[in-house]
Amino acid sequence: MLQGRSRYLVSTFALLLIGCEKIPEYQVPITLEPQYTFVAPQHIPELDRHGYLLFNTTAFSQKPLHKIYDEYRFHYAHFKCPMNDKFEVSGSIAADELEDNPIIYENHHFKYDVLFTICPENDASKLECIYDFKQLKALPKALSCRVIFGRMFGRSAVISENIKMDISQLEHAKVYEPPQLKENQ
């Protein structure tokens, strides 16, 4: 009985140490590639009413964000842009999952995929998200965004702030075509 309690206390203490670990303050300059693609509404029964628009773009960083993410054992990476009192741009940022390493361009920038929706703040249901290109006309054209890394039960860290995004281009977004996997020869 005592042995079980001591194991529980040791594991709880270890979790608390991980949760209290100091996360360095980063300010990584990130630029967004000015091209967006539209992903058609998903086939989810609850969203059959109208679906929602899911956009993707590309972010470039001189520092390897994926290494910061792994080194400090973050659980999530958010891409957020407060918009107005009604909506916010919210999504995720990740390295290209089809590659072993992120793509490095000749100017030595790491390339990351950014997926995002435009929804009411903190709306996980996606039921009231922007679903029609006409709705974009009522939104501000330029946003200031940030990338946040965080842990489920711990601190989060803002990795980059004041990333400029021009959403006026979303009206001209192309339909997303998933990349074709190459067959091994």
Across the structure, where does each feature detected by a protein language model lie?
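C-terminal motif of bacterial Sec signal peptides marking the signal peptidase cleavage site
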Residues: 18-19
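Short, solvent-exposed, Trp/other aromatic-anchored flexible loops in extracytoplasmic proteins
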Residues: 88-155
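Short, surface-exposed binding/anchoring microloops in extracellular/periplasmic proteins
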Residues: 37-94
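Surface-exposed edge beta-strand/loop patches
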Residues: 27-29, 126-185
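An extracellular/secretory-lumen and virion-surface interaction module
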Residues: 33-39, 43-46, 141, 152, ...
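Short, low-complexity, disordered segments immediately C-terminal to signal peptides
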Residues: 24-36
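Bacterial N-terminal signal peptides that target proteins for export
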Residues: 1-9
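Hydrophobic helical h-region of N-terminal Sec-dependent signal peptides
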Residues: 11-14
